[in-house]
Amino acid sequence: MEDLSKTDIRSLVRRSYGEIAADNAEGGDCCQDSLRIKSSAQEISRGIGYSDIEILNAPADANMGLGCGNPQLIAELQADETVIDLGSGGGFDCFLAAEKVGPRGYVIGIDMTPEMVSRARLLSKKHEFRNVDFRLGEIENLPVADNTADVIISNCVINLSPEKQRVYDEVYRVLKKGGRIAISDVVLVKELTETMKQDEKIYCG
């Protein structure tokens, strides 16, 4: 059997996360060998480094427990900064970032799944976030102008991309000079077996 194409992988990921958003389902820690653990999203978030204050400050429906760490811990976000979140999902990290950068700061969430973007936009409107913008797009081709961001964050998303170098090329393009990145993700430390390469669930986190 041939390896899955880049298009196939994107389609699988888009469908998988679209179903999660549409079903209002809770996910699982993507670092758990691709098994969806049954804990609540809040418990998952607490276990991967989010404080109780962060969990309570963000809209509850934005937190689906899909991350594998807390990029906010290393982002050191400052007032008035512009932040881009790669693979923003329901908007959990974006809403936290919006509070930290304040009313004169700005947060842009990028996600390729229409259902996730719709969910995040509804939550943003419901909770009256005025400094957050959710955009539909692929992280390999960001719908953002050059030299836009002071900080780029991402939580367990880049591993889902079949073209990781393109992602980092885009990061470099949209970052301002002196900008920084804060990424929580999983990495491959040894070659996957042929059986694993054909397992669609692995490509979906």
Question: Model-derived features: where do they sit?
Answer:
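A short glycine-rich, Lys/Arg-flanked "PGG" loop and its adjoining helix->strand segment in the class I
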Residues: 165-180
